[in-house]
């Protein structure tokens, strides 16, 4: 198997949190020196490839993929557009989970949804609907996420206490068995807030 492709896929799913060299080495079963060489090679490839909008950087002890500075204006124009046209239902689902379970890590969000959530988290961060709330005291010290003050302003809320209580939902044995159903429960409850207090044009799903 192509080790560079393996590393690239790990960097992609790791998202903004990044992934350590040691973690990569364990997952692809190579020694750290070999992984370091591969990371250097991959970083050089991104840097020299004019057909790619990405770079590979090292931040503290983690490696992560980031967009090239040359495209900052383009990305700003995208994220400055109406929320209703650029937030997917997946991002809203992640936002709903964060709303009711904050602060929590990306991995904890993934566990609720049953799928990887890095892309949705990046969208919400760029939209300033969520912010980093420190780091969890756990191996790797993963980032904790929570809602921002702008989240309250955008949805017309004075405080999180105005949200419908999660306990009002009816949890059946059938729904409790599935991660996807559990995530859907958070979303349905949050959707009530979108309908009652959110902007006139509520964000619509793209997928």
From Swiss-Prot:
One of its GO terms (cellular component) is cytoplasm. Keywords: Cell cycle, Cell division, Chromosome partition, Cytoplasm. Participates in chromosomal partition during cell division. May act via the formation of a condensin-like complex containing Smc and ScpA that pull DNA away from mid-cell into both cell halves. The keyword Cell division applies. NCBIfam families: SMC-Scp complex subunit ScpB (TIGR00281). Homodimer. Homodimerization may be required to stabilize the binding of ScpA to the Smc head domains. Component of a cohesin-like complex composed of ScpA, ScpB and the Smc homodimer, in which ScpA and ScpB bind to the head domain of Smc. The presence of the three proteins is required for the association of the complex with DNA. Its main location: cytoplasm. The keyword DNA-binding does not apply. One of its GO terms (biological process) is chromosome separation. Residues 173-207 are annotated as: Disordered. This is Segregation and condensation protein B. Belongs to the ScpB family. It comes from Latilactobacillus sakei subsp. sakei (strain 23K). InterPro entries: ScpB_csome_segregation, WH-like_DNA-bd_sf, WH_DNA-bd_sf. It is found in: Cytoplasm. It comes from the Bacteria.
């Amino acid at each position: 198997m192509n080790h560079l492709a393996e590393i690239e896929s790990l960097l992609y799913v790791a998202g903004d949190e990044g992934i350590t060299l040691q973690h990569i080495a364990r997952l692809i079963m190579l020694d750290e020196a070999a992984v370091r060489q591969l990371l250097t090679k991959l970083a050089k490839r991104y840097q020299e490839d004019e057909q790619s909008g990405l770079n590979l950087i090292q931040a503290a002890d983690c490696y992560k993929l980031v967009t090239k500075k040359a495209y900052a204006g383009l990305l700003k124009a995208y994220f400055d557009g109406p929320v209703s046209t650029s937030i997917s239902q997946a991002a809203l689902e992640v936002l709903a989970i964060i709303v009711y379970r904050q602060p929590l890590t990306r991995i904890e969000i993934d566990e609720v949804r049953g799928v990887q959530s890095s892309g949705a988290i990046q969208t919400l961060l760029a939209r300033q609907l969520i912010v980093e709330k420190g780091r969890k005291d756990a191996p790797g010290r993963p980032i904790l996420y929570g809602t921002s003050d702008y989240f309250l302003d955008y949805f017309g809320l004075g405080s999180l206490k105005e949200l419908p209580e999660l306990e009002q939902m009816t949890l059946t044995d059938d729904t409790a068995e599935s991660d996807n159903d559990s995530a859907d429960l958070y979303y349905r409850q949050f959707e009530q807030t979108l309908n009652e207090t959110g902007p006139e044009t509520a964000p619509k799903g793209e997928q």
